[in-house]
């Protein structure tokens, strides 16, 4: 994929769309500026009231209040605080397959169980925090809805807005798919897009890439069962802590010698618990390992080989291992054409110098991967570092000191609106 930064840095009026027989109007930068203050107010209310998990009643109400009065179809989730909003276009046009196209835009809404230490005057005080910037995702999606609503009469198809709880470890995307979000407009959506803000990346710069974008996440839980005894007489027992400690090193050594660095496997022993007293060798120890992979081949190999390695190593020391291996999330894979479209649209709106092709995938994981497994689309990042904050003082997402600027909200909303509107224009011509 050629980088937009290699092209002419001039960009077009935000309302223009590629030539089409349809009279399509999309929002302008002036339209986005008109709603900017309201977006900042909403973002700060969401931030101050951060909630965790699948049940986000305050967040859901703030969104509903923000979109009240719009000519839209709203469906609340069953058992989770999701919202699915459908905006019907006024020039709904069947494509070559006889289907009125629909495009999905997604914004996740949940926070993290992190006590906030940003110093913001709108900081949350509940022990929960929007440390990953999902308050901006939610607000940007509300902004895109409001902008497209103004121009709904010219849209040649429908837009589905996916307000998702439970991204942070609750598989909210999977649950919304089970409840039918991909088919909310009637026929299945033809494309899906999402963006994630980054507190440590330059304000107003977008990042994307073709193909593998974020890692798959698997979890391996290990119980090493030994034989407890007095700490002064280890030979009369079987020490699970010593064997567990050996596993930590052996797992890393195995990965570095058996897996290709150009199709990487990254593992981390994030939990290691065993024992209740310093003078007792316990009966068991427990380890939990996170496993990150970028390809189906390595994901499958890791699932087959790592539990076998653990079982054999533990048995060699005369102990037993119980291993539970769970695939939690698939990799986030961008469609090549949609990744190109993502960056081309951003470059056209804001200049090619602000649209960057990521050279490598991101080792974190994301449940929007569930959507991209079923629908072609693209996921990217958007920098929201505080203006004039030195790079060395920027804290990354998930830090209690991660400070996300809301100065890019209008651009974020405009970009999402154009992703949907321009994609509908293309689909209507196919």
Language-model segments: residues:
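Divalent metal-coordination and catalytic microenvironments
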Residues: 46, 85, 105, 134, ...
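Metal-dependent amide/peptide-bond hydrolase catalytic core
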Residues: 2-4, 18-21, 242-430
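Non-cysteine beta-strand/loop elements that form the S-adenosyl-L-methionine
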Residues: 104-106, 196, 220-222, 379-385
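Acidic/His- and Gly-rich active-site-bordering loop/insert found
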Residues: 4-13, 18-130, 135, 139-155
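Conserved acidic residues
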Residues: 71, 188-190, 376
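Histidine/acidic-residue-rich, glycine-tolerant segments that coordinate divalent metal ions
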Residues: 92-93, 112-129, 135-136, 148, ...
